[in-house]
């Protein structure tokens, strides 16, 4: 049964992928599917904002080509590219389909990698405003990692945006052990993953507008 569920998810994602890739912002964001400014940046040149993002299953790079780069582009327009470091969760986070079916909605390796990046942001740039986001499986990566961070790092995180939150029902629309006012969940009314399933319907690919408008506004309000 699990194999059939994974197969069904894979077929659905494969069929829907061209719709996502060819949306209006796709050509603009193709070249930014991998971002590593937190990893490569110097502590002597810390930015105002550090944005950490976990992509959806099967998306390329460490940022993907949908919600992650869209939010990043908006933040760079608001604060200036030199004042924002963008960092995707990569490496041990494979963004594979099978990890969606694990108890945490992703792998422990992925959660630990995101936690490492949050810790790096804190140690390298303790005065920067950290914001983060995730899409689909990436939301589980964010929820799992942030819930286990120290109070100091949680306080440094100003806002989190989650698109198509796969643990929305299970976590009651929030990130466990994290201030609800700092989290904004974007779940389309027809997106089945927001209701405790892993059925991928067309609505799961409709978060581009939220990523371009509502999410950056929320993060800007949190950052100040």
Swiss-Prot record:
Induction of synthesis: By contact with cutin.
Q: Sorted alphabetically, which InterPro entries does this protein's record hold?
A: AB_hydrolase_fold, Cutinase/axe, CUTINASE_1, CUTINASE_2, Cutinase_monf
Q: Which SUPFAM superfamilies match?
A: alpha/beta-Hydrolases (SSF53474)
Which cysteines pair up through disulfides? They are: 46-125, 187-194
Which GO cellular component terms are attached? extracellular region
Query: So which residues are the signal peptide here?
Result: 1-16
Quote the catalytic activity from the record. Answer: cutin + H2O = cutin monomers
> SMART domains in the record, alphabetically?
Cutinase (SM01110)
- The protein's site described by Transition state stabilizer is found at 57, 137
Q: Name one GO molecular function term.
A: cutinase activity
What does the record give as EC number?
3.1.1.74
Q: Which UniProt keywords apply?
A: Disulfide bond, Hydrolase, Secreted, Serine esterase, Signal, Virulence
What are its GO biological-process terms?
carbohydrate catabolic process
Task: Give a short account of what the protein does.
Answer: Catalyzes the hydrolysis of complex carboxylic polyesters found in the cell wall of plants. Degrades cutin, a macromolecule that forms the structure of the plant cuticle. Allows pathogenic fungi to penetrate through the cuticular barrier into the host plant during the initial stage of fungal infection.
In the record, the note on similarity to other proteins reads: Belongs to the cutinase family.
The entry's protein name is Cutinase 1
Q: Which organism is it from?
A: Colletotrichum gloeosporioides (Anthracnose fungus)
């Amino acid at each position: 049964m699990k194999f059939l569920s994974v197969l069904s998810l894979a077929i659905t994602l494969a069929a829907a992928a061209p719709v996502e890739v060819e949306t209006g912002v796709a050509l603009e964001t193709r070249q930014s599917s991998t971002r590593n400014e937190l990893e490569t940046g110097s502590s002597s040149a810390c930015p105002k904002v550090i944005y950490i993002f976990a992509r959806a299953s099967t998306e390329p790079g460490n940022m993907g080509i949908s919600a992650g780069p869209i939010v990043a582009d908006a933040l760079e327009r608001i604060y200036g590219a030199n004042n924002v470091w963008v960092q995707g969760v990569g490496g041990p986070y494979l963004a594979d389909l099978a990890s969606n079916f694990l108890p945490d909605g992703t792998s422990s390796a992925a959660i630990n990698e995101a936690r490492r990046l949050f810790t790096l942001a804190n140690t390298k740039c303790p005065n920067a405003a950290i914001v983060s986001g995730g899409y689909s499986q990436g939301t589980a990566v964010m929820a799992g990692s942030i819930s286990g961070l120290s109070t100091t790092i949680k306080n440094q995180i100003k806002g989190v945006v989650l698109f198509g939150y796969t643990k929305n029902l299970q976590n009651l629309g929030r990130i466990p052990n994290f201030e609800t006012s700092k989290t904004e969940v974007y779940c389309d009314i027809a997106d089945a993953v927001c209701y405790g399933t892993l059925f991928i319907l067309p609505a799961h690919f409709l978060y581009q507008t939220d990523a371009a408008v509502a999410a950056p506004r929320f993060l800007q309000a949190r950052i100040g």
